[in-house]
Amino acid sequence: MNEGRMVMSQPKSLMEIFLETIETALEKEIENAETEEKAREILNHFESADVEKIFNNFLSTVTKNTFSFIKTTMFEEVMRFRADEQEFLARQEQRWYRAFVASEAMYIMTLAAAEAYSKYIESLPKDEFQPKYWTYIAMKYIHGRAMQEFLEIITLMKNGFADGAYARWRSMYELSVISSFIVQYGENVAKKFYEASETEDRYEWARESNSFSAKKKHITFNDIQKVCSIDSDAWRKQYDLANKTVHASPQGTFGRLGDMGTHCVISVGRSDYGITTAGEHSAISLAQISA
């Protein structure tokens, strides 16, 4: 063994544990046998036994009994789980109700304004509406998607899923960048964006803006981010953190938003900690997309 390196032993298989248990019981039976003949009889009985068959029968019995127990008790366990869930949701609402009301009010007012604006645009004469048709279509769908994601974030925050809410904000931020880029570079870019929806193209549609070198092999989101009107430098750190939260990164695994800033806690469910970041960022992103 190399100095300073701990060698991790391989975990024992269920079969190995089973055999060790039988051997321990056998040794005890032989030790407690009244006569040597009785001890030999016990040993012979063990040696003639089909241990693999016994193990398979044991495993089958345990599996059936476990399934039967779970089936019998699952409704009781789920009702207990739901009671705990409702207790958490009530505490969460009591603690954060002002923030939730503000977020939901923003959603309601933005939706009403968007509906009124759509009716106004669609009532315009065709010749007045046509020059910005593709920009309107692209922005309408982007805005609709952002509205849904904003509501998803509210729902996740109410349920105590800070990391999930922040992951959804990541998508909202990307929508804010794309919407800013389309508005900035105009109708032809908006049309290419729409047409790309029927292809596998992710960002090549952005070449229509003439903002990228023809020598550039692929356009990335980061490329678009650099040339849009949103101050991406101010948001880069937060966006990078959201990426780590979404992906299987060590930072996103050991630094969960809902774990109270300590490695002593492993988040496996709801937490009332860490939801403010997603709430604030999503409100800003929705305002940017709605502008």
Protein language model regions, located:
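Short non-catalytic regulatory patches outside canonical folded cores
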Residues: N2, M8-S9, S123-K140, Q148-A162, ...
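A structured, mid-to-C-terminal "fold-capping" secondary-structure block
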Residues: W235-I266
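Extreme N-terminal leader/anchor segments
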Residues: M1-R98
